[in-house]
């Protein structure tokens, strides 16, 4: 199973790239973790946000064909590390790749929300989207380590 993190936004600060890559490189070969960056639509004072969201959503959905789609969204379901480890095992047994979607400044398009099979809430707080990349990478790595009895996760 391959895990794809599909996120709106490119040219992240160096600390975001380094933080994400620190956890990305730790994933096992049989579970590659890939970042796909979707260019953010141009926002300005008179920007058509609805159109921008629609374009970003189409690009995100085209990047995750035939994958299990999971959105990262505040109204989603919060998972403990143990619950995330169980989800990870269930996803592996499903036989499909997993696409985790992180929206841009205005969130996810209605099309992305409609296509999702699961919605995961990291926190009731609104988190900066660049930071979410690192939190998701670490959380998934921790869940993998728990499910494989790797010493990274300690209770």
Swiss-Prot record:
Instruction: Give binding positions for S-adenosyl-L-methionine.
Output: 72, 103, 122-127
Q: Which reaction does it catalyse?
A: pseudouridine(1915) in 23S rRNA + S-adenosyl-L-methionine = N(3)-methylpseudouridine(1915) in 23S rRNA + S-adenosyl-L-homocysteine + H(+)
Q: Which InterPro entries match?
A: Alpha/beta_knot_MTases, RlmH-like, tRNA_m1G_MTases_N
Q: Which GO terms describe its molecular function?
A: rRNA (pseudouridine-N3-)-methyltransferase activity
Cite the EC number. 2.1.1.177
As for subcellular location, the record says: Cytoplasm
SUPFAM superfamilies the UniProt entry points to:
alpha/beta knot
Q: What CDD domains does this protein map onto?
A: RlmH-like
Print the keywords alphabetically. Cytoplasm, Methyltransferase, rRNA processing, S-adenosyl-L-methionine, Transferase
Q: How does it assemble?
A: Homodimer.
Check the record and name the HAMAP family matching this protein: 23SrRNA_methyltr_H
Instruction: Enumerate the PANTHER family for this protein.
Output: METHYLTRANSFERASE, RIBOSOMAL RNA LARGE SUBUNIT METHYLTRANSFERASE H
Q: What does this protein do?
A: Specifically methylates the pseudouridine at position 1915 (m3Psi1915) in 23S rRNA.
Family the entry assigns:
Belongs to the RNA methyltransferase RlmH family.
Name by which UniProt lists this protein: Ribosomal RNA large subunit methyltransferase H
Give the organism the record lists: Histophilus somni (strain 2336)
Q: Which gene encodes it?
A: rlmH
């Amino acid at each position: 199973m391959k895990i794809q993190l599909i996120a709106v936004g490119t040219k992240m600060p160096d600390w975001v790239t380094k933080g994400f890559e620190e956890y990305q490189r730790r994933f096992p070969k049989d579970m590659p973790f890939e970042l796909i960056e979707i260019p953010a639509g141009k926002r300005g004072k008179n920007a058509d946000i609805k159109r921008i969201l629609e374009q970003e959503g189409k690009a995100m959905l085209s990047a995750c064909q035939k994958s299990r789609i999971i959105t990262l969204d505040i109204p989603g379901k919060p998972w403990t590390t143990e619950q995330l480890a169980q989800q990870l095992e269930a996803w592996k047994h499903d036989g499909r790749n997993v696409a985790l979607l992180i929206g841009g400044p205005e969130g996810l398009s209605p099309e992305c929300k409609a296509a999702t099979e699961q919605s995961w809430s990291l926190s009731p707080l609104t988190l900066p989207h660049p930071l979410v990349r690192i939190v998701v990478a670490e959380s998934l790595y921790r869940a993998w380590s728990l499910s494989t009895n790797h010493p990274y996760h300690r209770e």
